[in-house]
Amino acid sequence: MKEPIWAEINLEAIRHNIKEIRKMVGPNREIMAVVKANGYGHGAVPVARVALEAGATRLAVARLSEAQELRRAGLKVPILLLGYISPDQIGDALEYNVTLTVFRFDLAKKIAAIAQGRGQRATVHLKVDTGMGRIGFTPDEEGLAEITAVCALNGLDVEGIYTHFATADEQDKSYTRWQFKRFMLVLNRLEEQGITFSLRHCANSAAIMEFPETYLDLVRPGIILYGLYPSEEVDKGKLLLQPAMTLKARITHVKKVNSGTKISYGCTYTVPQETDIASLPLGYADGYPRLLSSKGQVLVKGKRARVVGRVCMDQCMVDVGHIAEVKVHDEVIIFGGAELPVEEVATWLGTINYEVVCWVGSRVPRVYIG
């Protein structure tokens, strides 16, 4: 028998989602598939390959190691590193033909100098902080002066410029409109100086759904690529997505227990009446948080079964006394699909769907279908 826990990834769902995004943004804009964090837990390389086959034209990651993994897998398309690059990584980034994000003049100078020393030009995108409060040039006179100086550096090919929205997935759209206005003002001021860019981009998943005016030259789908919506406040009817991940396990043990039996560490749960307890080979080391102790639910034979007692590092227990003929090796859905969506698990945890799928640990095999 194979591993008793696995994440089933439906690649046909990824294809479908990219095609839906393409229909929404039109034929003339580039799609940069965001595959950071191991493709939001789905597997960066398989997801990237399918996304590119389905119509994406570029990839984005957050760490150099993520870009290197994609290159070693034979992917040749442009890859944008969305975050910080340390000076001692710049040479490797150039060797792997990774497009870098520049958000400070001193960083730009360092990249340019290393590129010139290698007889290369480094392709970069400039990041403008229009209201996220993270990395980026400020959209004021000081920031504009820095951007102008960066664009004058030898050794750089300043291909693109971008920003990131903080609240595009919320019901109140005013802050996103304000951010977009600030970004366009920066672009207009730079254009007045004769500085233009091949790729202007700011539309994340929520903006793709809610703000068509922000599409510009390129869009950056992240969570929607995987079939999950950015929040409950976006109009889901605009984009018909298919979730790609279902986390599954097989029951490893079933036993009948009497009323008063204690379950798991700390004896925090006491069985109120005779029942059947099933053990699952799933714990917090696999990305099933301890916070779900006596709170989470799973699907056994299509019925809900409650997690009882504390979630352990490698195991957890569920009460299956109300479900007939539960046996060892029966398949259990931990989350995924319409009957137990990842969003429900996120609600139990007080978090977001992004975090739940990213939590799925590296020792959980990904099994690809479709």
UniProtKB/Swiss-Prot annotation:
Its cofactor is pyridoxal 5'-phosphate. GO terms for molecular function: alanine racemase activity; pyridoxal phosphate binding. The modification N6-(pyridoxal phosphate)lysine is found at residue 36. The gene is alr. The keyword Cell membrane does not apply. GO terms for cellular component: cytosol. This is Alanine racemase. It comes from the Bacteria. Substrate binds at residues 134, 313. Its EC number is 5.1.1.1. The active site is at residues 36, 265. Keywords: Isomerase, Pyridoxal phosphate. It catalyses: L-alanine = D-alanine. One of its GO terms (biological process) is D-alanine biosynthetic process. InterPro entries: Ala_racemase (IPR000821), Ala_racemase/Decarboxylase_C (IPR009006), Ala_racemase_C (IPR011079), Ala_racemase_N (IPR001608), Ala_racemase_pyridoxalP-BS (IPR020622), PLP-binding_barrel (IPR029066). Pathway: Amino-acid biosynthesis; D-alanine biosynthesis; D-alanine from L-alanine: step 1/1. Belongs to the alanine racemase family. NCBIfam families: alr. HAMAP family: Ala_racemase (MF_01201). It comes from Desulforamulus reducens (strain ATCC BAA-1160 / DSM 100696 / MI-1) (Desulfotomaculum reducens). Catalyzes the interconversion of L-alanine and D-alanine. May also act on other amino acids. CDD domains: PLPDE_III_AR. It holds the Pfam family Ala_racemase_N.
